Amino acid sequence: FAVMLERANAGGRNGTALYARRLLALLGIGLAHALLVWSGDILLTYALLGFVLLLCFRRTPVSRLPKWGVALFVLPLLLTFAMAGFATLAAQDPQAAAEFQKGMAAQAQQIAALADGERLAVGAGSYADAVAQRATDTGAMLGFLVFFAPTLLGVFLFGAWFMRSGTIRDSAAHLPLFRRLRNIGFGIGLPLMLWSAWTHPTMSF
């Protein structure tokens, strides 16, 4: 997105208008793919978040982009810790624990109902049934957007900073930064992934 805006503006065109038109096209393609082929299509999400970037961060100073990126990227992690803390506290109160388990069970039932509906529509229904089910699934997926959208927005803002700051255009002059990012990424990400694979080798859906 940042590359498109920068190039359009540098060429004397209205980058915002071009950006909006292409986002609308991406939204249409993503919606068609989600309804006609697969409800988990990421293009629809990218288009919606692209409009958020356009409306909220188009005029953000370059120096603030990585700060916003970090804040949005870690927000879901903080929410996860908060939910884990709430679950721990709830477990100490029998009534609260029962309510928490009731809510989790209801959510599990909703997910199971979606999965059963998808199997029935795709496995035994008509193509129209499958499209209708994918519409339901797409709506449910968008309902979870609030949980993972901040992470994606954070990544987008990092990318915008790399472009608008000139770091990508003159990568040779910023090799120390790239090496530092590589070392931090491997130093934190690899141990976490190994720990995750060790503690949760499989997941049940």
Put a short name on every predicted segment.
Residues 18-35, 71-75, 182-193:
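Small-polar-interrupted transmembrane alpha-helices in polytopic inner-membrane proteins
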